[in-house]
Amino acid sequence: MTEAQKERILGHLKSDTELFTPVGISAVDRTAGYYLPNGYWNGNVWLSHQWFVWKTMLDLGETDFAYKIAETALNAWKREVEYSYYTFEMFSIETGRGGWFHNFGGLSAPINLWSAAYFTPGTYQSGFDTFCESAAFNDTYTAFCGRFTNAGAYDGALLVVMAENGSYSVTLNGASAVFTARFDGMLEITLPKGCKNAEIRIQLV
């Protein structure tokens, strides 16, 4: 994939008039002739396919968009469950409401994975191109050590959720790592492309 191709694809995914909607990424582009507001697969949002897009965003280091995908899905699911107490099959782009089968187990895995990836201490996540050699937290989730290989063509992202105790230091092979604290305890760490069996250490400071 060339850089121009990557940017063009990201542009379509992020566009509020094409694929991205208030309830998540549409199954089809809303500018397509076969998009129907009252359609089934061609007019709604499912969660499962978005998980694959989310993981790919971690491969590309697109952490802001990855979080937007997860946050949008979690909020859409939360609103519907609080209103109806149902876990519907999909969400209508036009109404924001859930629809079709009301106890759809296929919604459960992406929701649980996104919730854990950003809000559950003791959780780590990466993209498809990153291989975890080993990983361990201490009992209080204030320290972490892991070894990771990024086999992708881009600098990827490793998400690690620590305890909400304060600030953390992050090292990559003993040197200061590039990372962002999205919020207290939730760290987004850059894994440089080509790194092999790289040691990540996180410590409460």
Pin down the residues of each PLM region.
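C-terminal capping/lid segments that line or modulate ligand- or cofactor-binding pockets
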Residues: M1-T17, G39-Y141
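Short, isolated positions in well-ordered beta-strands
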Residues: A143, A177-V178
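Short, well-ordered beta-strand segments enriched in hydrophobic/aromatic residues
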Residues: T142-N150
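Surface-exposed beta-strand/loop patches in extracellular or lumenal glycoproteins
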Residues: T149-G166
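Generic long, charged, amphipathic alpha-helical segments
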Residues: F20-W46
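A short tyrosine-centered beta-strand micro-motif
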Residues: Y168-V170, K196
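C-terminal beta-strand-rich structural cap/linker in extracellular carbohydrate-active enzymes
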Residues: A181-V205
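Short strand-turn-strand beta-turns centered on an Asx-Gly dipeptide
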Residues: T171-A175
